Amino acid sequence: MSKKTNEMSVNEYKSALRYLLDKKKINHELYLKILTFHYRAANQAITMTELAAHLGYGDYSAANPRYGFIGSLFASHLGRDMPTDRRGNSRYFSLIARSEIEDNEQKVVGKEFVFYLHQNLSTALEELGLVQQKLTV
């Protein structure tokens, strides 16, 4: 795992994805829908506002915990200790993506976090056949 980005190896992601799909009593379809949406996004970059709209939620606050749940499940499965923010909240999303605040004038006035899917997670999704590999021209 890269200390700078918390990106894991392709094999670790594959193991974590299998764990997610085998886990009982969770909505596998929802979490795969989230990962597929992120994978298919331009530059594999999304905001939580975009994810919320895709999932049919009113705003980003409903999408945040679902996105974080994927990371928390990965962390639990692989025994990862996660960095925390200033409030002491674990940054589970960092196992899925790196984030930046981007001036997002086209979508929202002000600044919004943009999440870039980790390349190794993208590769793991492809290798497991969970997404169709993107074609490059």
Each predicted region: which residue ranges?
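Short helix-capping/hinge SLiMs at alpha-helix to coil transitions
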Residues: 39-43
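Short Lys/Arg-enriched helix C-cap and helix-to-coil transition segments
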Residues: 76-89
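Short alpha-helical "packing" element that flanks the helix-turn-helix/winged-helix DNA-binding module
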Residues: 30-37
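Short acidic, hydrophobic short linear motifs in intrinsically disordered regions
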Residues: 45-50
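Phospho-regulated, low-complexity intrinsically disordered regions of nuclear gene-regulatory
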Residues: 87-137
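Short, basic interhelical loop/turn and adjoining N-cap
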Residues: 56-62
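DNA major-groove recognition helices of helix-turn-helix
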Residues: 63-77
